[in-house]
Every structure is written in structure tokens, then in C-alpha cells.
């Protein structure tokens, strides 16, 4: 079961006496107990303000001025607030267990008006742990707190996750949220709804029976049913529109003949004049255009001649300028040839000198070799002389040393002395002072090893020395060669530079070998380049003459084209005469054909207009007569189909109307006889009992009762038996069920519910299986849903029926139009367009005339073209052989490349010529540069040192060997003293000395002779070097002179220079010849221009005269055209068939129409004046003004609510169709209105019965309510007798009063009011209009009378009035009425709110001390039974046993007024429990 929403607490912030107070509200009764001024009313006022924050309604009477005669500015709220921000908040929990805090922010507005500013807000998603006071206050310290403004509260809540804060700008939005969330019972859409809610709360607050509520119980308890009123208002509007439309159609129909006549004559009058002016303008324009064409042609010829003159003058100027350039180029070419010849002679001298230098170079090299050999012989002689000197010196020393004796003693003495001397020498040489003869053998081995090592080292150095001696002279020679080639450089760089020079020499020799091939290639390419330049010049000249640039790929095709053109031009010139004759013959044939077509054109145009109208009407395109006849057959078939479909739709619409009428019966009875039987049997229809069943439950109950769903429920079946005897006026099957209609339930059957079906056990041996119907009709909601769908279907069917009716009539009229068309125009309409053919023939005629007039010019142009083509072919014959050259874009680049390569090769040749011999000499000896020759002296010193070391080692070893060999001689010490004399050895030494001296003399003489010869060789070498240097210097001077000349003096240079000179001479001759030709042509062109200028002046004079005539009429014609286009009448006036009539015929036609129009507009002053003004022939635009005025007059007469078009012609065509269709629609709606007069009575009666049942159910909840002597309270609902009579007449006797409902002057509401007056003539209606009375009669609430009755003591049921009841009884009775109103609102709003929400119920009761304990207990019981919360205020002597009681005591503490609150929950035997958070210490807002 859905739990009902509850108010959890009320929070007051900064109210008078309450700074921050939260009252937890009991689920039933919350009592505010306290003395006067304790704050009970303030608390209730805060609750009401949060519930209804509408300052226009809030009025707390117990705080306003008593006895005041004028309205109080303070309605009780301003004085209950303290300065600053105030809050009143309601904490609620709804049926969905959602916590919602709603409230208002209040603030006093400064001023004498004592106004209060109110801002409502709502908070959703707030956790249960957060108290309302925590939200709106901020604790500053233990004794102080601050109230947060609304914007800070918003920021604080937005920072909390899941919490939503909403501020409302309107009370309607605030109450809408409260209704959707189940806080209030009714949706308060307007100020009137809020006023009712406030009056309810106010009546609850102050107690008693509220006259404001009891007087308007119908507004509180009965919901407004505006459906009937709105339906009949819509019906009245539709009927009013239909009647106005019908009247407008009749008026339009009466004007139809006038429309036709006025349109026809106005069109003839204006269109004839319009087309006549158009024809005249076309003729004048044709003449002007012809003159302009001739003028344009002459101007073109003159412009062509001028262009030709300018072109030839420019070409002549170009040739004059080119002649000077060519003369300068020719002179430069001649000078260049002379320079080339001079350079060639200079080159021959250079070659002779180079040959001489080569010869001197060879002789110089040979002399160098001779000098080198002489130097070698000189060195040999010096060595020999030096050796002879050494030998003489050695022999002399030997002769002095060896003079011993020849005997043994002398020998032993000598050997002993020699041994001693050898030992001493060995000591000295070996630096061994302790050396003895015995130890000499040991030391000998050591020094022999040293000697061997020194010898090996000396031999190695000797080998190096030998090689170094050989490389020494080569290095110097190679170094000098490198210096000669490269210039001065360091000796250590010679090797790297030499290798680089050799590599460069190889490259330079390779390049030098290419000089001659490159010269030949360059000569060839330069020749091709000159030819290419010449070809480009020829091509540029050709393109300039042709007036178009050509690609070289197009030249061959152009050549063929020009040759073909030459052939074709030669043929065309020969065929010109025959062509001229053929053109004249064709021109005559065209003239006769055009005349015949102009006679046929008007008939064809009339047929086409008729065909276009038919095509527009049917939306089809017809291309043949067969298409027309086939479409006519389709129209017939379509008409039959549309009639059949219209009849079917009409039948279905009638069936829907019948079903709607049947379902609209009160109580859901589909048979009127059942209502009468129910009243006769004293029962109630079962469908009425279940009239309030929901749409979801309708299928179940419909299947549950099955065929008995139309049964009658009677209290006692036995009492019905006598009525059944002889009953005939009843349905075929009549079901009767015994039961209490006031407390009927579905327990009469045993039911098993299946899926979408039920099994009903009617008896032990009889079951019924019924499925849920797809379209249930059981219950008001189901019937209303079905009626709504049927109404929608009926609207669709009505619209479809009207559309089909219109289509049928339109098809019939279209069929008639097709029949007329077939009879009148079918024979000619599908022939070819004569106007199109005329245009083609006229175009061809103009072409023929132009061809004939320009034939001679064409022949002349062809001859000119022939000459130009021949000239072009001649030029192309010179260009085509050079196409390859023109296509070679890289030729100039290749010439530059070859020239650069030739320059490099020539430079290389000069390098080779200058340094070739040095490089050749350097190449075989370059390897000697790897080692520095300056190391030779060091090597020489090393060799000398090694040699000395080897000699020293050898001497040491020899000395030790000698000591070892002479070990035996040391024993000849006794012979040492012996002397020896001379011997033969001395003689031999002397002989050898003489021979050595003689050899020395010979060597010295030879040395002197070779020295003189070497001096001669050096003199010859110096002479050769001087001659070589002189020749070399002369060669360098010649080469510089050749470079200064700046001409490449190769073998073909002279030939190229001569060819270039001859070519320039030929170009100069051609240029002079062309210049002479241009001078002659220019003279002839000037004469032709003079002739064209004279002809042009005459043509301009003729053209301007004709143009002046056209311009004179243009202003009026432009005004006419602008007026025609702006008013969209061109289609009406531009009748092409009139274009073939003569000006006299058109003028006659216009005059006849003018006479008819004068009679037609005689009664219309405006059109008559406009027609009179349009007769001026000089102002054709005034005729258009008349036509526009006539159309505007007709357009204003068209009712736009009937015919949706601005075209009067179309309006005439639609009148008949629209008239019949709308007449039928009006008839249908009137028939519907007759049916609706019965339906409205049924709906009102059904609604009354439903509300009576609902009030009856409400009364059941108040049966046990008692207050004092009042035992029960109930509501009586009765139908007024006058209104019940009206319902009877509407449902049963409406045919007797059809004069009211069929009247075109009365609406349905007015007819209903007249009927009411007719039935109740005694009632005075006052000043109210019938329309107002009729609208009131459509509201079912005006049919009912409601009053509250109480069952009081022995008096029984009495009308509840305050004068007849005690105060407590009045309070209890009033509270009962309010509870009934709240419950009624909930029932009414249940369909508007979610089904899972049961709204909060809360009422107030101030000054409850006027009730006794029994009444208080009754209130508690009522609250518990209805799940209602109640807040009551009572003095301190009231102590209820249930609910929650708050004791309020107002105190003053330190000039601060506050209310002390203590909360108690009931009075049980246990000790009272103080509610948490109710004891409040005084606090002051910061």
C-alpha cells in the first residue's frame, strides 16, 4: 500500500520570539499549548506562509486592528518578523520516501507600507542527518549565530553533493513542484485556485462553518467539466463560419455574371491596345536594329582597317628600328671577322714560337746532360788526384818507418818492439790499461764481436749513403721542377704538391686532348643555335601575322589546315555565283511559308491556351490526341472510384457518429431502455456502479462480467418479479443482480484470473472463459478513451469526405472541359508550333539576307584569307624544317655548357703547354721527394762516424789480434837492443814513391784540363738558357695579345664569322624589302579608311533618327511594362494570337470593348473615371491602370474565406465547386448539431450521476463523526427541478423545439437559453444575455444544489448553520466539511499526479479550547482514520493524551524577547520524555 506523505517539521528562523526553532510535527496531532501571546498563532502563521506565499491572500486577523474602518497595511505578517533575513521552512517526506524541504525567505521592506518581501525555494536530496537550522544559520561562537542570506544558502547547498536547490520566481511554479512531489492535494494553476486553497486553510485555522466555503461548495467539491462547453463553443464557431461562408458564396454567385462580363471586355479592351503597341514597337525596334547592325558592321570594318593600319604602322616602325639594329649587327659581324683573322695570324706566330721553344728545350736538356757528365768526370779527376796525394804521403811515411836491419836479431828486436808497441797500442786503442799478453785472447773475442757489429752497421749506412748520393741530385732536380710549376713552397710540402701536380697534369692533358673536339662541337651547336634563333624569329613573326600564338606541336597540323584552307577557298570562290542564286531562291520560298504559318498561328494558339488550362487543372502533360482521350477515360474511372470511396467514407462516418452517441449515454448504457428499466425496478445500472473504474482495470471488469456488464443491480430480486411478467420493451437478454448499489462489490462470482483472461465459475457445472477485450468499454474512463479515438477518427473521416466530395465535383467539371476541348481544338492542338517555325524561318530569312548582303564582302575576305593562307604556308615551309630546333629547349644551355668545357680545355692546354715538360721530368723522379734531401749531410756524418767506429773497432781488434799473434815475440826482449841497417825494402819504397809522385803530377794536369772544358760547357748552357728565356717572354707577350683580342682563334672561327656576316647581310636586305612593301600597303589602307568614314557618317545619321523615334515611345512603354509586371497581369494581356492581327483590326477590337465597358461600369464611379482617363491614346499606361483597377475591384469582391485565390478568373471557376461542397458540409454539421442536443443532456446527466456517487462515497466517511449533540454529518446533492426538466426535454422531446436549434440566427448556447426560458417562463433572467445563460447551462454544476446537514440530537437531520449549533459543534462540523473537500481534491487530482504518490493531509485549528474532550478525541480518531495531520492551538489547560504537545512560554531576558519551548509526546504512565532539540537558549543574531 502506498504510504501517505507527511510533514516532518516546521522551522522558524528570525521570527518574533523564535531565532532558530524547529517543531517536529506528529504524524497525527501536534498541539501548541501556551497562554496568550505565547506564539501559537505566529507558529501557525509561519506554516501557512510557507504553504501559500501569496501576499494578496495572507491575512492573519487576530493581529490586525480591531474596529478599523479602512484596510490595514499590515495584514499580520510584518509584525511577526524581526529585522533582517527570516525563513519559514517545511520539512516533508513523500510517498516515494523523498525528503523535500520547501520554504520561503522573508524580509521586511523599509517604509510606511509595512511590506514584506517573500522568495519561495525548495531543497531536494538533503540527507536525513542534516537539520534545517544547520542550513540557514552559521555559528559564530558558543553564544552567537548568524542567519545566512538566500544567495549564501544557495552556494552552500550547491557545494553539497546530490543536493538540488531551486528558487522560484512565481508562486505557480512553487505550487506546481509541491503538487508533483505530493505536498499539496490539488494543482493550483491560477490565483483563483490559490484563493480556494487559502480559504480552506483559513476556515480550518479559525474554526467553525465557513460561509465562504458552504456558499460555494460546488466550486470546492465538484470539478469543472469544461469539455461539453468547449465542444459546443467549437461547434457554434463552426456553424457560424459555415453560415457566413454560405452567405458569402451566395453574394459571390450573384456577382459571377458581372465578373465574367467585366473580365472579358476589360481584357479585350486593354489587351488589343497592349498588343498593338507591342507590334508597333517591335517594327520600330526591328528597323532600328537593322540600322544598328549595318552601323555595327561598318564600324567593325573601320575598326578592322584602323587595326590593320595600326598594325602595319607598328610593323613598319619595327622594321625601321630593326634596320638600324641589323646594320649595327652587320658592321659588328664584319669587325668580328677581321678580329678573327688577326687572331688567326697571331695564333700562327704563337705556334712558331712554341716550336722554337720546344727545340731550345731539347737542346737545353742535352746541354744539361753534357754539363752533368763533365761535372762527374771532374769529380773523378779530383778524387784521383787526391788518391795520388794520399799514396805519396803514405809511401813517404812507410819509407821513414822501415829502416831496420835484415838480420834475425834485428827482426826479433823489431818483433819484440813491435809486440810491445802492439800491446801498448792495444791498451791505448782498447782503453785497457791492465791488458796483458795473456788476457789478450779473451778480449779479442769481445772486440771481434764489436768489429762485426760495426762492420754491419757501416755496410748498411754505406748502402744508404750510396742511395742517398744518387737521390741527392734527383731530389734537387725534382724540387726545382715543383717550384717552377707551383711556385715557391716549403721543402716538406714538395711531395704532396708534386703528387697533386701530377694528378692535375693527367687531368689537364686529358682536357687538353678535348680542345679540338669541343671546338668542333661548339661550332656545330652555335650554328644550330643561330638557326634556332632564326626559327624563333620566323615563328614569332608568323604568330604575330596570324594574331594567335601556336605551339610547335600545332604547326604541322596548321600547315595542313592552311593548305586545306587554300584549296577550300579556291573552290569557294569558284562556287560563289551558284551559291548566290540558291540563296535567293530559298529566300522566296521562306517568304511564302511564313505567310501561310501566320494565318494558322492564331487558331493553334487558342487551342494551346485551352490545352494549357486543362494541363494546369489536371497536372498532366499531353503530347498527342490519344493521350487526351485516354486521360478522359481515366477521368471517368476516377470519378466512379471517388464516388464509391465517398459513399464508403460517409457510411463509416455515420457509423462512428452512431457509436459516439451510443457511448455518450449516461451511466454507460448503450440502450436507453435500460435506464428506464433501472428507474422502474428501483435499481442502478452495473455500468454506473463501475463508472469510475480506471482505464487499466476496465479490461478485467469487462471480462469478469461478460454479457452481464449491462445488468441492473436491484436491492431485492423478489420485488422485481412482478414487473417482469409481460415485459416486452427490453433488450433480448436482461441481466438482474441482487445487491446494494451503495456497497456493491464483485464477490458475486468465483473468479480465476489468467493472463489477459478470466475464468468465471457461474455454477458448479457452468464456467465462462472471457478474454480481456482489446478496446474495453466498461467504465467512464474506457468509454471516454474510446470516444476520444472515435472523435479523432471522425475528424479524419469528415475531412476525407469533404475532400472526396470536392474531388468528385472537380472531376466532373474537368470532364466537361475535356469534352469541349475535344470538340473544338483537338484537330489542331498537337500540330507543330507555327510560331516556333516562324521564328526559325525568320531567323533563316535574316541569315539569308545577311548572307546575300555580305556575299561580296565574304568573297573579298576569302581572297584576303587566301593570300594570308598562302603567306602562312610559305612561312611554315621555312619553319617546319626547323621544328626540331624549336623543340630543343636545352640547346642554349648545351652551348653554354660546351663553351664552359672548351674554356676549361683551353686553359688545360695552356697549362700542359707551359708545364708539360716539367711534369714529364718530374713524374719518373717524384718518389725521391718522399724523403727530405737535407738529411743527406746527417746520413753522411752518420756514415763517417760509423766508418770511424768500424775503423776503430777494426784497429782495436787488429791490435788485439796482433798482440795475440805476437805473444811469442814478448820473449825476444834480449834482441831489442839490437839495431839494424838499411835493406832492399828501403829501395823499393823509394821507387814506389817516385812512381806515386809522377802519377800525382799527371792527375793534376788532367784536373786542370777538365776544368777548362767544364767552363766551356757552362758557357754554352748559359747561352741556351738566355735564348730560351727570351723566346719564352716573347711567347707570353703573344699569348697576352691574343687574349686581349678576345676571340677564339680555332680552325672554324673564321668560317663561322664569315657565315654570320653573310646571314646578317641577307636579313638586312629582307628587312629593307619588307619595309618598302609596308609603305605601299599603308597608303592603300588610308584611302580605304576615308571611304568607310564617309559611309559610317551616313549610317549614324539614319540610325539616330530611328532611335529617336524608339526612345520617344520607350518611356511610356517602360511604364506600361513595369505596371504590368508589378501587378502580375502580363499573362492576361500578352495574348499571342493578337500579334497576328493588323493595327486596324486591333484598334477596332479595342473600340468595341470600350463601348461595352462604358455600359458595364456606368454604376461604378471609380471604374468609370478610370475608364474615361484610359481613353487617351498618348497615355497607354492608363489603360493598364484601368485593367488593374478592374481586377482589384473584382479581387476585393472575392471572399478569401471561401476561395483561396487572388485571380478573379480562377475564382469564377471555383465558385460552383466550393458552393456545393460547403453547402453539403453545412448540412452535415447541422445534422450533427441535432444529434449533439441529445448528447449534451446525456453527458450532463451522466456527470451528475457520477458526482452524486462520489459525494455518496464521501458521506460514508463522515457517518461516524460526532461533535457534542451532532451524531453525523452529510452532504445533500439534488438536481434542481427546472434544470431536470431541461434535461428531459433535451433528451426526449428535442424534436418539438427544432425551431430554436435549426435557426440560423441563434447559436446553440442561445438556443439552449431560449429553451430554458420557454420551459421556465416564471424565472426572471435579469440583464444576462442568452449566450451567457446558455454557457451556464452547459456547466453541470449549475444543475445541482448542495447543502451540509447534521444529525443533531432529537431534531434529526438539520441544515448545518452556525446559529443552530454550538461553537464546538460548528468547529467539528466545519472540520468535517474541510476533510471532505481535501479528499475530494485528492480524488480529482489523482489522474494528474503520479500513481505512486499519496499527498500530505494537514489542517489547522486555532483556539481548540472551544472543543470538549470528546470532540478532541473525535478529531484524533478522524485524523487517524483519514491519515491526516492536524495542528491545533490550545491554552495550557488542554492536555491531549495522544500526539505531540509543545508548551510555549514567552520570556524576556536581558531586553531580548524569546519563546521557551518544551515538547512532550503524549501523556503515558511513564515519565514525560523531552523531545530532542526543543529547549532553546536565548540567542542574538550577529
UniProtKB/Swiss-Prot annotation:
The residues listed in the UniProt record as binding ATP, with positions renumbered to this chain, are 34-41
One Pfam family assigned to this protein is MukB
* Record-level GO BP terms: cell division; chromosome condensation; chromosome segregation; DNA replication
Q: Which domain of life is it from?
A: Bacteria
Localization terms from the record: Cytoplasm, Nucleoid
Q: Where is this region: Flexible hinge?
A: 666-783
Indicate the quaternary assembly.
Answer: Homodimerization via its hinge domain. Binds to DNA via its C-terminal region. Interacts, and probably forms a ternary complex, with MukE and MukF via its C-terminal region. The complex formation is stimulated by calcium or magnesium. Interacts with tubulin-related protein FtsZ.
Would you tell me the protein name for this molecule? Chromosome partition protein MukB
Identify the species of origin: Shigella boydii serotype 4 (strain Sb227)
Name the gene behind this protein.
mukB
Amino acid at each position: 500500500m502506498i504510504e501517505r506523505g507527511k510533514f516532518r517539521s516546521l522551522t522558524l528562523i528570525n521570527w518574533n520570539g523564535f531565532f532558530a526553532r524547529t517543531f517536529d510535527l506528529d504524524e497525527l496531532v501536534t498541539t501548541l499549548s501556551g497562554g496568550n501571546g505565547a506564539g501559537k498563532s505566529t507558529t501557525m502563521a509561519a506554516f501557512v506562509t510557507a504553504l501559500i506565499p501569496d501576499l494578496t491572500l495572507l491575512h492573519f486577523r487576530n493581529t490586525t486592528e480591531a474596529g478599523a474602518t479602512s484596510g490595514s497595511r499590515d495584514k499580520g505578517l510584518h509584525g511577526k518578523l524581526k529585522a533582517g533575513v527570516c525563513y519559514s521552512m517545511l520539512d516533508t517526506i513523500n510517498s516515494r520516501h523523498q525528503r523535500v524541504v520547501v520554504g520561503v525567505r522573508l524580509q521586511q521592506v523599509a517604509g510606511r507600507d509595512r511590506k514584506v518581501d517573500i522568495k519561495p525555494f525548495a531543497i531536494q536530496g538533503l540527507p536525513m542527518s542534516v537539520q534545517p537550522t544547520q542550513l540557514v544559520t552559521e555559528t559564530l561562537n558558543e553564544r552567537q549565530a548568524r542567519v545566512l542570506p538566500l544567495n549564501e544558502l544557495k552556494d552552500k547547498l550547491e557545494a553539497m553533493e546530490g543536493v538540488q536547490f531551486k528558487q522560484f520566481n512565481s508562486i505557480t511554479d512553487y505550487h506546481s513542484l509541491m503538487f508533483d512531489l505530493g505536498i499539496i492535494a490539488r494543482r493550483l494553476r491560477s490565483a483563483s485556485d490559490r484563493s480556494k486553497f487559502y480559504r480552506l486553510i483559513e476556515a480550518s485555522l479559525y474554526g467553525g462553518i465557513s460561509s465562504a466555503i458552504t456558499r460555494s461548495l460546488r466550486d470546492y467539491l465538484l470539478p469543472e467539466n469544461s469539455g461539453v462547453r468547449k465542444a459546443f463553443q467549437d461547434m457554434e464557431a463552426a456553424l457560424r463560419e459555415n453560415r457566413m461562408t454560405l452567405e458569402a458564396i451566395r453574394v459571390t454567385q450573384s456577382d459571377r455574371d458581372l465578373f465574367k462580363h467585366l473580365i472579358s471586355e476589360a481584357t479585350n479592351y486593354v489587351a488589343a491596345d497592349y498588343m498593338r503597341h507591342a507590334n508597333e514597337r517591335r517594327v520600330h525596334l526591328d528597323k532600328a536594329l537593322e540600322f544598328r547592325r549595318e552601323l555595327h558592321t561598318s564600324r567593325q570594318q573601320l575598326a578592322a582597317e584602323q587595326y590593320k593600319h595600326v598594325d602595319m604602322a607598328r610593323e613598319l616602325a619595327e622594321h625601321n628600328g630593326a634596320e638600324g639594329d641589323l646594320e649595327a649587327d652587320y658592321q659588328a659581324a664584319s669587325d668580328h671577322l677581321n678580329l678573327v683573322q688577326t687572331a688567326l695570324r697571331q695564333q700562327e706566330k704563337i705556334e712558331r714560337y712554341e716550336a722554337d721553344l720546344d727545340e731550345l728545350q731539347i737542346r737545353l736538356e742535352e746541354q744539361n746532360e753534357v754539363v752533368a757528365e763533365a761535372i762527374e768526370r771532374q769529380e773523378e779527376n779530383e778524387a784521383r788526384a787526391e788518391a795520388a796525394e794520399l799514396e805519396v804521403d803514405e809511401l813517404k811515411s812507410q819509407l821513414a818507418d822501415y829502416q831496420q836491419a835484415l838480420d834475425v836479431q834485428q827482426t826479433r828486436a823489431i818483433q819484440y818492439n813491435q809486440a810491445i808497441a802492439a800491446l801498448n797500442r792495444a791498451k791505448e786503442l782498447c782503453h785497457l790499461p791492465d791488458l796483458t799478453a795473456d788476457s789478450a785472447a779473451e778480449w779479442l773475442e769481445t772486440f771481434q764481436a764489436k768489429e762485426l757489429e760495426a762492420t754491419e752497421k757501416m755496410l748498411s749506412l754505406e748502402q744508404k749513403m750510396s742511395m742517398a748520393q744518387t737521390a741527392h741530385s734527383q731530389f734537387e732536380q725534382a724540387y726545382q721542377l715543383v717550384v717552377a710549376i707551383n711556385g715557391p713552397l716549403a721543402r716538406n710540402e714538395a711531395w704532396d704538391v708534386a703528387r697533386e701536380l701530377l694528378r692535375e697534369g693527367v687531368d689537364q692533358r686529358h682536357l687538353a686532348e678535348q680542345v679540338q673536339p669541343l671546338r668542333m662541337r661548339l661550332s656545330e651547336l652555335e650554328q644550330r643555335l643561330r638557326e634556332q634563333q632564326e626559327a624563333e624569329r620566323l615563328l614569332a613573326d608568323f604568330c604575330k601575322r596570324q594574331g594567335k600564338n601556336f605551339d610547335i606541336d600545332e604547326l604541322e597540323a596548321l600547315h595542313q589546315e592552311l593548305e586545306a584552307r587554300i584549296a577550300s577557298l579556291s573552290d569557294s570562290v569558284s562556287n560563289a555565283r551558284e551559291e548566290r542564286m540558291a540563296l535567293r531562291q530559298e529566300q522566296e520560298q521562306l517568304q511564302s511559308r511564313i505567310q501561310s504559318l501566320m494565318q494558322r498561328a492564331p487558331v493553334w494558339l487558342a487551342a494551346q491556351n485551352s490545352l494549357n488550362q486543362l494541363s494546369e487543372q489536371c497536372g498532366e502533360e499531353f503530347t498527342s490526341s490519344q493521350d487526351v482521350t485516354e486521360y478522359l477515360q481515366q477521368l471517368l474511372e476516377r470519378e466512379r472510384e471517388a464516388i464509391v470511396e465517398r459513399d464508403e467514407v460517409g457510411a463509416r462516418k455515420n457509423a462512428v457518429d452512431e457509436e459516439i452517441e451510443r457511448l455518450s449515454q449516461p451511466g454507460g448504457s448503450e440502450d436507453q431502455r435500460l435506464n428506464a428499466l433501472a428507474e422502474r425496478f428501483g435499481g442502478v445500472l452495473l455500468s454506473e456502479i463501475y463508472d469510475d473504474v480506471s482505464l487499466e482495470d476496465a479490461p478485467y471488469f469487462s471480462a469478469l462480467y461478460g454479457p452481464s456488464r449491462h445488468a441492473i443491480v436491484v436491492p431485492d430480486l423478489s420485488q422485481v418479479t412482478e414487473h417482469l411478467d409481460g415485459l416486452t420493451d427490453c433488450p433480448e437478454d436482461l441481466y438482474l443482480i441482487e445487491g446494494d448499489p451503495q456497497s456493491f462489490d464483485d464477490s458475486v462470482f468465483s473468479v480465476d484470473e489468467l493472463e489477459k483472461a478470466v475464468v468465471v465459475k457461474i455454477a458448479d457445472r457452468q464456467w465462462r472463459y472471457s478474454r480481456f477485450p482489446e478496446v474495453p468499454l466498461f467504465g467512464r474512463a474506457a468509454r471516454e478513451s474510446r470516444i476520444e479515438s472515435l472523435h479523432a477518427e471522425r475528424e479524419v473521416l469528415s475531412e476525407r469526405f469533404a475532400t472526396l466530395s470536392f474531388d468528385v465535383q472537380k472531376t466532373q467539371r474537368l470532364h466537361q472541359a475535356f469534352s469541349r476541348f475535344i470538340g473544338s481544338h483537338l484537330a489542331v492542338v498537337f500540330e507543330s508550333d507555327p510560331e516556333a517555325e516562324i521564328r526559325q524561318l525568320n531567323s533563316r530569312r535574316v541569315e539569308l539576307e545577311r548572307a546575300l548582303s555580305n556575299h561580296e564582302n565574304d568573297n573579298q575576305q576569302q581572297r584576303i584569307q587566301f593570300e594570308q593562307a598562302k603567306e602562312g604556308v610559305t612561312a611554315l615551309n621555312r619553319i617546319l624544317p626547323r621544328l626540331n630546333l624549336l623543340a630543343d629547349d636545352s640547346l642554349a644551355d648545351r652551348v653554354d655548357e660546351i663553351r664552359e668545357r672548351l674554356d676549361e680545355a683551353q686553359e688545360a692546354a695552356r697549362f700542359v703547354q707551359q708545364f708539360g715538360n716539367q711534369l714529364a721530368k718530374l713524374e719518373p723522379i717524384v718518389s725521391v721527394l718522399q724523403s727530405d734531401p737535407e738529411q743527406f749531410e746527417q746520413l753522411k756524418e752518420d756514415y763517417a762516424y760509423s766508418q770511424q767506429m768500424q775503423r776503430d773497432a777494426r784497429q782495436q781488434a787488429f791490435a788485439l789480434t796482433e798482440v795475440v799473434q805476437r805473444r811469442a815475440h814478448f820473449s825476444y826482449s834480449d834482441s831489442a837492443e839490437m839495431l839494424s841497417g838499411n835493406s832492399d825494402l828501403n829501395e823499393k819504397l823509394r821507387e814506389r814513391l817516385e812512381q806515386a809522385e809522377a802519377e800525382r803530377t799527371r792527375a793534376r794536369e788532367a784536373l786542370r784540363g777538365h776544368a777548362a772544358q767544364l767552363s766551356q760547357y757552362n758557357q754554352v748552357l748559359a747561352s741556351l738558357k738566355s735564348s730560351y728565356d727570351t723566346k719564352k717572354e716573347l711567347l707570353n707577350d703573344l699569348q697576352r695579345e691574343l687574349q686581349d683580342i678576345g676571340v677564339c682563334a680555332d680552325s672554324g672561327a673564321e668560317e663561322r664569322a664569315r657565315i654570320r656576316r653573310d646571314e646578317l647581310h641577307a636579313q638586312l636586305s629582307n628587312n629593307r624589302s619588307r619595309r618598302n612593301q609596308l609603305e605601299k600597303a599603308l597608303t592603300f589602307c588610308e584611302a580605304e579608311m576615308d571611304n568607310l568614314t564617309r559611309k559610317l557618317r551616313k549610317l549614324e545619321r539614319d540610325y539616330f533618327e530611328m532611335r529617336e523615334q524608339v526612345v520617344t515611345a520607350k518611356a511610356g512603354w517602360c511604364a506600361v511594362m513595369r505596371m504590368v509586371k508589378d501587378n502580375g497581369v502580363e499573362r492576361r494581356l500578352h495574348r499571342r494570337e493578337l500579334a497576328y492581327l493588323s493595327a486596324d483590326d486591333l484598334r477596332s477590337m479595342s473600340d468595341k470593348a470600350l463601348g461595352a465597358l462604358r455600359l458595364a461600369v456606368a454604376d461604378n464611379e471609380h471604374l468609370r473615371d478610370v475608364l474615361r482617363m484610359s481613353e487617351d491614346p498618348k497615355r497607354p499606361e492608363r489603360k493598364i491602370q484601368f485593367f488593374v483597377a478592374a481586377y482589384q475591384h473584382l479581387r476585393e469582391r472575392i471572399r478569401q474565406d471561401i476561395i483561396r485565390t487572388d485571380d478573379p478568373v480562377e475564382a469564377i471557376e471555383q465558385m460552383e465547386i466550393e458552393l456545393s461542397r460547403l453547402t453539403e458540409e453545412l448540412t452535415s454539421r447541422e445534422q450533427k448539431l441535432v444529434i449533439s442536443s441529445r448528447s449534451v443532456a446525456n453527458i450532463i446527466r451522466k456527470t451528475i450521476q457520477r458526482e452524486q456517487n462520489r459525494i455518496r462515497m464521501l458521506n460514508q466517511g463522515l457517518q461516524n463523526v460526532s461533535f457534542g449533540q451532532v451524531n453525523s454529518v452529510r452532504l445533500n446533492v439534488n438536481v434542481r427541478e427546472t434544470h431536470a426538466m431541461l434535461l428531459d426535454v433535451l433528451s426526449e422531446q428535442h424534436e418539438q423545439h427544432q425551431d430554436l436549434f435549426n435557426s440560423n440566427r441563434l447559436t446553440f448556447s442561445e438556443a439552449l437559453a431560449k429553451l430554458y426560458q420557454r420551459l421556465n417562463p416564471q424565472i426572471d433572467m435579469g440583464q444576462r444575455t442568452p449566450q451567457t445563460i446558455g454557457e451556464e447551462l452547459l456547466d453541470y454544476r449549475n444543475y445541482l444544489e448542495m447543502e451540509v446537514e447534521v444529525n443533531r440530537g432529537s431534531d434529526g437531520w438539520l441544515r448545518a448553520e452556525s446559529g443552530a449549533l454550538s461553537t464546538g459543534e460548528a468547529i467539528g462540523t466545519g472540520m468535517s466539511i474541510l476533510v471532505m473537500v481535501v479528499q475530494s481534491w485528492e480524488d480529482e487530482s489523482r489522474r494528474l499526479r503520479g500513481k505512486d504518490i499519496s499527498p500530505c493531509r494537514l489542517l489547522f485549528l486555532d483556539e481548540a479550547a472551544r472543543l470538549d474532550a470528546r470532540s478532541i478525541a473525535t478529531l484524533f480518531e478522524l485524523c487517524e482514520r483519514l491519515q491526516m495531520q492536524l495542528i491545533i492551538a490550545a491554552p495550557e489547560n488542554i492536555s491531549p493524551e495522544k500526539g505531540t504537545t509543545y508548551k510555549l512560554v514567552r520570556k524576556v531576558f536581558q531586553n531580548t524577547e524569546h519563546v521557551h519551548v518544551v515538547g512532550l509526546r503524549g501523556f503515558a504512565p511513564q515519565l514525560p520524555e523531552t523531545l530532542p532539540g526543543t529547549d532553546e537558549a536565548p540567542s542574538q543574531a550577529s
